[in-house]
């Protein structure tokens, strides 16, 4: 707070014609920016600075500026201390994402929440896998939902962090993931990736009852979440939004007793407060900088999804 910095803009190629360069702040009460690109910290918080170069065609770039209070080192909201840190696809910075080694390492490091992705196979088995195709993680061009689990086991995970250290790293089932969560007393956070029908949702609901900790079920797909809520009135459900948390989205969440999940860059302190006023919890993703995560914790975010322990 109180510091000033001047943004440096580099034009490529060096001989390119640029008529004007303009600057804009998303919140002038936190940070102001002058016509020459000098930014001044006014209050603790997080803002976006947009730089626009106009040379006949406008090109924009955005940076985030985080302001801490000089005295306390935090934003001006008191630290709630209640935010839950969710590890994204296990400890994926130390083992391949969404594998039993990644989940086990998360548990060994003391993770309380571990997120994963679930898909239903041709034979009805639920497996832990993010992509619709095996190519990125297993090296074969096959759509996973067109396979049975016996077929999936032929293609172990061969890429990802330290993949060579984990031979025959088979894609786990949902049951195996829950067993790992139970072993380390972690709360499962499960994203539904498949377009489940009523039978699929019913089977999924039966499986997650094997979790000792009450799971959190999340998805971009609203329909399976609604079907799950109709048969399970108590499970925690988060509807993931692709853009900002709108009033319409909050009304929909209130209707079905959902919480809400969104990218942190699309969310501000006022939005979090508005959700809380409707008794809706807020989960934000995907944090890689502990300073930014700290800011959102101070704003009362209920869950923060991160790549590492924060």
Positions of the model-derived regions?
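Phosphate-group recognition and catalysis centered on beta-loop-alpha active-site segments
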Residues: 48, 68-310
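Extracytoplasmic soluble-region selector
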Residues: 1-74
């Amino acid at each position: 707070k109180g510091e000033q910095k001047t943004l440096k803009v580099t034009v490529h190629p060096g001989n390119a014609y640029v008529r004007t360069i303009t600057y804009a702040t998303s919140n002038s009460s936190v940070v102001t920016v002058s016509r020459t690109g000098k930014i001044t910290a006014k209050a603790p918080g997080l803002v976006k600075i947009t730089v626009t170069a106009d040379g006949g065609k406008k090109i924009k770039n955005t940076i985030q500026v985080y302001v801490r209070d000089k005295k306390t080192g935090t934003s001006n909201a008191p630290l709630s201390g209640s935010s839950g840190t969710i590890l994204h696809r296990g400890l994926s910075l130390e083992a391949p994402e969404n594998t039993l080694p990644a989940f086990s390492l998360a548990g060994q490091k003391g993770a309380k929440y571990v997120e994963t992705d679930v898909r239903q196979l041709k034979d009805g088995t639920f497996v832990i896998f993010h992509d619709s195709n095996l190519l990125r993680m297993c090296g074969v061009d096959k759509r996973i939902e067109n396979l049975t689990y016996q077929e999936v086991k032929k293609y172990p995970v061969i890429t990802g962090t330290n993949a060579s250290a984990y031979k025959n790293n088979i894609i786990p089932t949902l049951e195996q993931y829950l067993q790992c969560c139970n072993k380390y007393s972690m709360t499962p956070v499960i994203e539904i990736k498949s377009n489940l029908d009523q039978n699929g949702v019913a089977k999924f609901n039966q499986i997650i009852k094997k979790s000792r900790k009450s799971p959190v079920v999340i998805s971009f797909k609203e329909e399976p979440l609604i079907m799950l809520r109709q048969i399970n009135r108590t499970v925690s459900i988060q509807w993931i939004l692709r853009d900002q948390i709108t009033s319409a989205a909050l009304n929909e969440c209130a209707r079905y007793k959902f919480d809400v999940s969104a990218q942190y860059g699309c969310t501000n302190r006022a939005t979090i407060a508005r959700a809380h006023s409707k008794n809706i919890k807020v989960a934000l993703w995907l944090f890689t900088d502990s300073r930014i995560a700290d800011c959102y914790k101070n704003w009362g975010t209920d869950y923060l999804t991160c790549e590492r322990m924060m």
